[in-house]
């Protein structure tokens, strides 16, 4: 499981170094095989171990090619999906279209989301955190049935 937020940098070639605390697990459990794609709801990237991504592809395969919203989701997630492997230094090369989608330049945040990572531009991440705080304090959050009994 991946958790925590790490400030990282992109190098001049568009590579990121995955923090050391995740590298061994990615290598041993997932053979360093990853898939990077875009988030359809935010300007960030999603990084999945290949095995987890295969389960998502199976769900996408069930979606229609003739229904607009389903086709749009398939087009976005699969069209940007890029299979890659960690290099010997624990780095991933982010293709230019993915960097552009998430407005990634130099400073980024790698955020563990249990089964995947999100990769954000650092400034966009700070804005997202503020929006998340506002959402948590809103009536919509308080009225959510799924969160009614959630406590820490």
Curated annotation (Swiss-Prot):
**Assembly mode:** Forms oligomers.
Compartments in which it is found: Cytoplasm, Nucleoid
Principal cellular location given in the protein's record:
cytoplasm
Q: Which GO terms describe its biological process?
A: negative regulation of DNA-templated transcription initiation
Keyword Ligase among record annotations = no
- Repeat as a keyword of this entry, yes or no, is yes
A GO cellular component annotation in the UniProt record: nucleoid
PROSITE patterns assigned: SPOVT_ABRB
**What superkingdom does the record give?**
Bacteria
Q: Name one Pfam family in it.
A: MraZ
What name does UniProt use for this protein?
Transcriptional regulator MraZ
Q: Name its species.
A: Shewanella loihica (strain ATCC BAA-1088 / PV-4)
Q: Which gene encodes it?
A: mraZ
Transmembrane annotation, as ranges: none
Keyword field:
Cytoplasm, DNA-binding, Repeat, Transcription, Transcription regulation
InterPro entries from the xrefs? Answer: MraZ (IPR003444), MraZ_C (IPR035644), MraZ_dom (IPR020603), MraZ_N (IPR035642), MraZ_sf (IPR038619), SpoVT-AbrB_dom (IPR007159), SpoVT-AbrB_sf (IPR037914)
For this chain, the family text in UniProt reads:
Belongs to the MraZ family.
Show the taxonomic lineage. Bacteria, Pseudomonadati, Pseudomonadota, Gammaproteobacteria, Alteromonadales
GO MF annotations, alphabetized: DNA-binding transcription factor activity; transcription cis-regulatory region binding
NCBIfam families for this protein: division/cell wall cluster transcriptional repressor MraZ
* Ranges where the SpoVT-AbrB domain occurs: 5-52, 81-124
Name the Gene3D superfamilies on file.
Transcriptional regulator MraZ domain
Per its UniProt record, what PANTHER family does this chain match?
A: TRANSCRIPTIONAL REGULATOR MRAZ
């Amino acid at each position: 499981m991946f958790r925590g937020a790490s400030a990282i940098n992109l190098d001049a070639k568009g590579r990121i170094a995955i923090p050391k605390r995740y590298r061994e697990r990615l290598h041993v459990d997932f053979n360093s095989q990853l898939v990077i794609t875009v988030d359809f709801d935010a300007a960030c990237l999603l990084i999945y171990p290949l095995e987890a991504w295969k389960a998502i592809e199976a769900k996408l395969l069930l979606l229609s090619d003739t229904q607009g919203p389903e086709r749009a989701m398939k087009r976005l997630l699969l069209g940007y999906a890029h299979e890659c492997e960690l290099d010997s230094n624990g780095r991933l090369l982010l293709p230019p279209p993915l960097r552009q989608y998430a407005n990634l330049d130099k400073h980024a945040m790698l955020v563990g989301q249990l089964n995947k990572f999100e990769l954000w531009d650092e400034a966009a991440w700070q804005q997202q955190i503020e929006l998340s705080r506002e959402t948590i304090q809103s009536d919509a959050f308080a009225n959510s049935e799924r969160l009614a009994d959630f406590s820490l």
